[in-house]
Structure formats: C-alpha cells, structure tokens
C-alpha cells in the first residue's frame, strides 16, 4: 500500500504546482525575492520610515456552492482576494502580498488551476503579489467535487498615515461606493430563498436580471484598492467594508458610541438582485440591510468640504459613488 492508495496523489499535487508557477509569476513585484515553490516566500520592504504591517484573512463562504452547481471555478478566486484586500485598505494600508489555502477531498488539477487563475487575477487588480499557498488533499473530508478556500493578505502603511476613526464627527458625509452585486456574504440565505423556497435552478434565465441566475450569483466581489488610492490626497476619516452584517453591523465598527450613521435610503439605486431576494424570501427590510450590502460595498466618511472632490476623483476613474448619508449625534449604530 502507498499514499496514493490512501487517497493522496502527490504526483497530481506536483503537477498542479508546475501549472500554478507561471500564473503566480505574472503577479510578482520587485519586492519578491524568490519565486513560487520554496518552503517560504521572501518579501523585501523598501522606502518606509515607520511601517505598520496590516494583515487579514477570509474565505468565500457558501458562494462556493454556486460555483459547484455551475461547475464554474474561475471567479471565486477574485472573491477570495477581494474579501481580504478590502479589509486591509480600510486602515489606510495598501496590499503587498497574498497567500491562499485550497482544500479538497480529491485533487483535480483542472479545477484547482481555474481557482488559482481567479486568485491571480484578483491580485493583479489589487496590485499585490501571489507569493505562495497550500493545496491540501483530504480524502473523505469533503464531498466529491467540492473544496474550500481561505486567503491571507498582508499590507503596509506608514504609521502616521493610518486612518484615525476618532476624528469622525457629527456632520461628516458618508459616501457609498457601488458594489458589483451580492459580493461574498449572505449566500446561505440566498440559496435558501432561490433553491429551497422557490425551486430555482442556476440555469434559469431571470428576465429582471437579464442573465441566468447562476451567473448573477457568481458575479465577483468588487476590489476597491484603486478606488481608495484615488482618494489619497484627501483626508479619509473612516472606511467600512460592507460584508457579513451589512450596513447594520459594519458601519458602527468605526463609530464612537455617541454618534451614528444616518443612511438616506433612495440616494442610490438598489440592484435588482436584492429586490428579488427580498420579495421571494419575504424578508424584512432591516434584515436585508443586516445581511447584504444592498448595492454599496464600501463606505467612506469624509468632511463635507471634501465631498465634491471625492466624487470627482471617484467618477474620474469610473467608480460609481454616491453621498448616502451623514454622521449624526445619537446612541450609535445605523439609522435607516
């Protein structure tokens, strides 16, 4: 008996590594001192006076179930990168490098390489290097054809350039940056609504969406790195990545208890997919705002005097941005 008899194919793993190398190489920067395949990756920090390292880890959640149903694996890697780098940039940091963890019951290189291509694409969009990862073949641990993903990102910022959310005060403006869709949160509810309660198939064409349901649900999470870079000349007082917990749980994470975010509903167009979920699932409005991004994937808080400049900068790079509310004196939280 050998390891392959037990369900672990080392040769398949080595084959995948060779397939990954040229993909990852396209993301590398001059700071990366060694290529893919070593025991550890080396990254040189240059031109910083008082650097602060910022880290984040995340996954894609049950959005992966949609990828399995569609047998489409080239976009969930973008989601993985987005979930990590969008958390990094709210501190004022820029992403430096990324690592991934791919685990499956039986390794299929053709599937894994599609996932890695998506991760590499996400890294290119975010301007960070894919410097390593782990592929784990775990017989009997996952259902056939399924896998799980985790991502790890490290960024950097000068200490004096860290965003200080303590400066947020009454009257400050809340700018919302448009999402690309559902992003990567709320998919357990999404699947319940569409597939269990209403018996949809991922292949069903949805006239309101103009596409098949599966394609709409797999729309990759938007990466906001370049959008936030466009605002670097302005004083950003705070940012919130609208992920699990939606508006209700994420915006208060950057607010003192004596102030609240007053959101002006109707100041942006809520994408059709959310209206569909709410109607088909008979979901209360506040629950929608606590589960989904509702069309706003990133919130930026600035002084009112900086609003016009911020919108000009964002619109100039093709970013859809809206003034969606203001900071008010209150017991904290979000006022809809």
UniProtKB/Swiss-Prot annotation:
Pathway stated in the Swiss-Prot or TrEMBL entry: Purine metabolism; IMP biosynthesis via de novo pathway; 5-amino-1-(5-phospho-D-ribosyl)imidazole from N(2)-formyl-N(1)-(5-phospho-D-ribosyl)glycinamide: step 2/2
Entry EC no(s): 6.3.3.1
Gene Ontology CC terms: cytosol
Family of the protein in this entry: Belongs to the AIR synthase family.
Name of the protein in its database record: Phosphoribosylformylglycinamidine cyclo-ligase
Gene Ontology MF, one: ATP binding
SUPFAM superfamilies on file: PurM C-terminal domain-like, PurM N-terminal domain-like
PANTHER family to which the protein is assigned, alphabetical: TRIFUNCTIONAL PURINE BIOSYNTHETIC PROTEIN ADENOSINE-3, TRIFUNCTIONAL PURINE BIOSYNTHETIC PROTEIN ADENOSINE-3-RELATED
């Amino acid at each position: 008996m050998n390891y392959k008899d037990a369900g672990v194919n080392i040769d398949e793993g080595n084959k995948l590594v060779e397939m990954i190398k040229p993909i990852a190489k396209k993301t590398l920067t001059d700071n990366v001192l060694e290529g893919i395949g070593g025991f550890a990756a080396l990254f040189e920090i240059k031109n910083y006076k008082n650097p602060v390292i910022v880290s984040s880890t995340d996954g894609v959640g049950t959005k992966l179930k949609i990828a399995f149903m569609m047998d489409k694996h080239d976009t969930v890697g973008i989601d993985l990168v987005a979930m990590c780098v969008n958390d990094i940039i709210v501190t004022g940091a820029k992403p430096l490098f990324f690592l991934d963890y791919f685990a499956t019951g039986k390794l299929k290189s053709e599937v894994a390489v599609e996932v890695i291509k998506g991760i590499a694409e996400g890294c290119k969009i975010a301007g960070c290097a894919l410097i390593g990862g782990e592929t784990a073949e775990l017989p009997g641990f996952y259902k056939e054809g399924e896998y799980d993903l985790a991502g790890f990102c490290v960024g950097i910022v000068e200490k004096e350039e860290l965003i200080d959310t303590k400066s947020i005060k009454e009257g400050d403006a809340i700018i919302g940056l448009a999402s690309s869709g559902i992003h990567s949160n709320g998919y357990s509810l999404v699947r319940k609504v569409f597939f269990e309660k209403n018996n949809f198939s991922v292949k069903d064409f949805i006239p309101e969406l103009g596409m098949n349901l599966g394609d709409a649900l797999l729309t990759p999470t938007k990466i906001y790195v370049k959008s936030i870079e466009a605002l670097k000349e302005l004083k950003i007082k705070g940012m919130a990545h609208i992920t699990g917990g939606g508006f209700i749980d994420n915006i208060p994470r950057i607010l003192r208890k004596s102030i609240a975010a007053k959101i002006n509903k109707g100041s942006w167009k809520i994408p059709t997919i959310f209206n569909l979920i709410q109607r088909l699932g008979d979901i209360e409005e506040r629950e929608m705002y606590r589960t989904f991004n509702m069309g706003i994937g990133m919130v930026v808080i600035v002084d009112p005097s900086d609003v016009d400049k911020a919108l000009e900068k964002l619109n100039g790079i093709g970013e859809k941005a809206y003034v969606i509310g203001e900071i008010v004196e209150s017991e904290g939280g979000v006022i809809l």
